[in-house]
Amino acid sequence: SFPTRRSSDLTPYFKFRQALGTAEEEIYQMFKKELTEGISGSGIKPGVIKLASSKGEITEYEKMFFRAGARVQQETGAVILTHTQEGTMGPEQVRLLIEHGADPGKIIIGHMCGNTDPEYHKQVLDQGVRIGMDRFGIQGMVGAPFDQERVQTLLALLNDGYEDQILLAHDTVNIWLGRPPVMPEQAAKIMENWQPGHIFTNILPQL
């Protein structure tokens, strides 16, 4: 499986700035400048603010980004899209963002299909945000359940009326930086549906 990156593994720039006490303000300024002016002088502006937390915790390092993201969202109206590691910390992400002023109607908690408990999903959805069931096709790797388990979870949520708060996707990689990975034959077979047509061909007919 792919390794899990933790905040302790990250490049030292913001870790150093965190020690100086200036990191959160710099993160805020970076987010705002990229959203309003573009990335690195390119003029290309992001469509979302992406935030991420670790498996089973939101570290103090990660919380800086969540607070800065919530602050920038209030000023720009940008959508916040998060990464959850194996579907953990979804409710905690939402509470942290809302506590710092983020609009729940513009929050998407991503990779929630890493968790197959409908009641857990409802803890997130009932706070007024949307969730991404967005890793269809990724199975047996990075802690991912099998698609059939995801479908059963999705059906339970649809039956309970949450259809307007759920987004479906594949989390596919369209352009690899460097060489694309070569998977062992068994893994390649399990992952054969990790491609953009999978939802339309195989998932939607089950709903």
Model-assigned labels for residue ranges:
Residues 2-7:
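Short, small-residue-biased leader/transition segments that mark boundaries at the very start
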Residues 38-115:
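Divalent metal-binding pocket/active-site signature
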Residues 9-11, 53-55, 86-88, 113-116, ...:
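Active-site-proximal loop/turn and secondary-structure-junction residues that shape catalytic pockets
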Residues 80, 133-135, 163-185:
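Short acidic/histidine-rich active-site segments
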Residues 1, 34-44, 71-74, 98-101, ...:
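Acidic (Asp/Glu)-rich catalytic clusters
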Residues 194-207:
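Mid-to-C-terminal alpha-helical segments outside catalytic/metal-binding sites
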Residues 1, 20-33:
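Glycine-rich anion/phosphate-binding loops
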Residues 109-115, 135-159:
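Active-site glycine- and acidic-residue-rich loops that bind
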